[in-house]
Amino acid sequence: MESSFFLGKTLYGLNQLFLHLILGWPAYLLAGKTGGPRYGTSNHFWPTSPFSKKLWPSIWAKKVWISDWGIIFMLSLLVFWSMKFGIYSMVSLYLGPLLVVNIWLVIYTWLHHTDTDVPHLGASEFSYMRGAFLSIDRPYGKILDFLHHSIGSTHAIHHIEPTVPHYHARLATRILKNKFPKVYLYNPTPIYKSLWHIATNCVAVKKDYEIDRYVWKQPNHNKIK
């Protein structure tokens, strides 16, 4: 909240976009950032101390180490690639596309679970299904829907019934809208506008004690003179 006050709306929004879209995914994998307090400071590549062990069941630790060997092998290939063909080749053909994939992962997670009028439920209010119905569907257009299997425009059904395959998601979403019109959430705002709106307005939450939920506070973007 303080950074919003000091930076002003535009700089704060750009800062949020950079932190979320560029640094957000690596920060989550390496330190569990934005993952909530349940698992503590977790690391997806190191399932033991000094990081929290709560993220991984004990039987998975061995699988994490095996996965790490695969990552080391891939990093070795990238070093060889850079030395043989130049770092520009590696960045443009591998690292750049990987960054784009990571950005889309964050966009979908951010946009479909966040909006100024969508609360986060407290413990006494939360249930799996109530939480799932707070997922938001948004319009991505035919091209992105084709490339991404409509995961953004049919995101709610992905949480309400995870076993629905992507090729039935549009039909399942139509049924969902017809059966639950009062609780199904859809925001028709174009994606780039929604992204900017959330980056500049979803700054901090406050507790609504009457109904045990967290709602977004109105941000103060007025810079100190």
Ranges and model annotations:
Residues 127-145:
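Cytosolic juxtamembrane regulatory segments of multi-pass membrane proteins
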Residues 111-112, 139-140, 190-196:
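Juxtamembrane/interface motifs at transmembrane-helix termini
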Residues 1-96, 166-225:
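Non-catalytic, topology-defining segments of multipass membrane proteins
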Residues 95-99, 144, 148-151:
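Membrane-embedded alpha-helical segments that form the functional core of polytopic membrane enzymes
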Residues 20, 77-83, 126-132, 154-163:
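Alpha-helical membrane-embedding segments
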Residues 61, 79, 106, 146, ...:
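A generic hydrophobic-helix recognition signal that picks specific residues
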Residues 22-37, 94-133:
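Transmembrane alpha-helical segments that form the membrane-embedded catalytic/substrate-channel core
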Residues 108-117, 148-164:
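Histidine-centered catalytic micro-motifs
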